[in-house]
Amino acid sequence: MFPIRNTVPTRYPPVITWVLIATNCIAFLFEISLSPYELEQLLYQFALVPARYSEILASDEINPVIDDVLPLFTMMFLHGGWLHLILNMWTLWLFGPTIEDRLGHSRYLAFYLTCGVVASVAHIFFNPVSIVPALGASGAIAGVLGSYMRLFPLARVVVVVPILFIPLFFEVYAFFYVGFWFLMQVLQGMLDLAVTPTRADVAWWAHIGGFVAGFALVPLIVQSERRYRAYYRDEGVLGFDPEGRM
């Protein structure tokens, strides 16, 4: 299933989502402008290398400096290829505006970064000796998906399912689409631990950590109905679609 439309209407322009997408794209364009050696140095400095933190925790004196903390944030603005970037930004573009609309711009930015950091910590915890740099916005975006499922479990997501090269379009409930995605992350994460406990090519546990953070945190910071408006879990009330048509 590939999502192509989020049917929940929004009221305000998603300024922070636009900024996040632009920042990720600019960072990626900078990445591909580098030589292979320069790119390797960039990734080992600003992407997330779990073994680095295991060494810090194993030392007698834990005294983290800015170079140790920075990758927890910067890793979520780096990507490993065009497809990696496009899939992440597409998902953020579909679901980010809805959550930004409900949280407000400043809260949404803090929420997004927090989910990204929790995702980084989860990846370190489950892959403590990995020397493979982890990078990508998917952990933070997983937090957006978790919050979307929490706030609008009965919202409809339009997805396309290609069967024998024929695209079929369906409307599914958010709890089904996002829940299925989360279940796949858990299964893949468990399989990864069982098969390759010292190496993680995909940061499954970062996705899981970000999702759980988003699902748990969003009720605490969502705007009250007095500041926004009353809204429903599906937003499909009174027989109107998001454009106001019957």
Model-derived regions: residue spans:
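A detector for small-residue-rich transmembrane helices and their helix-helix packing motifs
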Residues: 1-246
